[in-house]
């Protein structure tokens, strides 16, 4: 009479689960970040001063904005994560706007201060 449908088990992940285009560059970047999260991160330990952690931030930045912009955003995030750097909630921006060009990667440094105000 009643059919019980097995409920799908939600996968637990700490990484970005929203929609993103699966291009070769993004897949390569995300594969490298995931490799780091599974292997090296457990040896180093969680010492990030931000939420989301730096590896989660880079994963989401690459998924949302591509390998080039996401990698630069991630590099600058790691540079901000030192003992004299910033701390607290620092999300990846949903859009970069019109002032960010691939040939000016140093502009990605300003993203955090600009979108968190």
From Swiss-Prot:
It comes from Bartonella quintana (strain Toulouse) (Rochalimaea quintana). It is found in: Cell inner membrane. InterPro entries: Membr_insert_effic_factor_YidD. This is Putative membrane protein insertion efficiency factor. It is a peripheral membrane protein. NCBIfam families: membrane protein insertion efficiency factor YidD (TIGR00278). Keywords: Cell inner membrane, Cell membrane, Membrane. Its main location: membrane. One of its GO terms (cellular component) is plasma membrane. Belongs to the UPF0161 family. Could be involved in insertion of integral membrane proteins into the membrane.
């Amino acid at each position: 009479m009643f059919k019980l449908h097995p409920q799908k088990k939600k996968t637990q992940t700490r990484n970005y689960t929203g929609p993103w285009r699966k291009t070769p560059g993004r897949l390569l970047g995300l594969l490298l970040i995931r490799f780091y999260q599974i292997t090296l991160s457990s040896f180093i330990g969680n010492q990030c001063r931000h939420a989301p952690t730096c590896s989660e931030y880079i994963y989401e930045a690459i998924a949302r904005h591509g390998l080039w912009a996401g990698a630069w955003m991630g590099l600058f995030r790691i540079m901000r994560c030192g003992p004299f750097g910033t701390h607290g909630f620092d999300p990846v921006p949903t859009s970069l706007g019109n002032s960010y060009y691939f040939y000016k990667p140093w502009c990605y440094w300003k993203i955090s201060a600009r979108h968190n105000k």
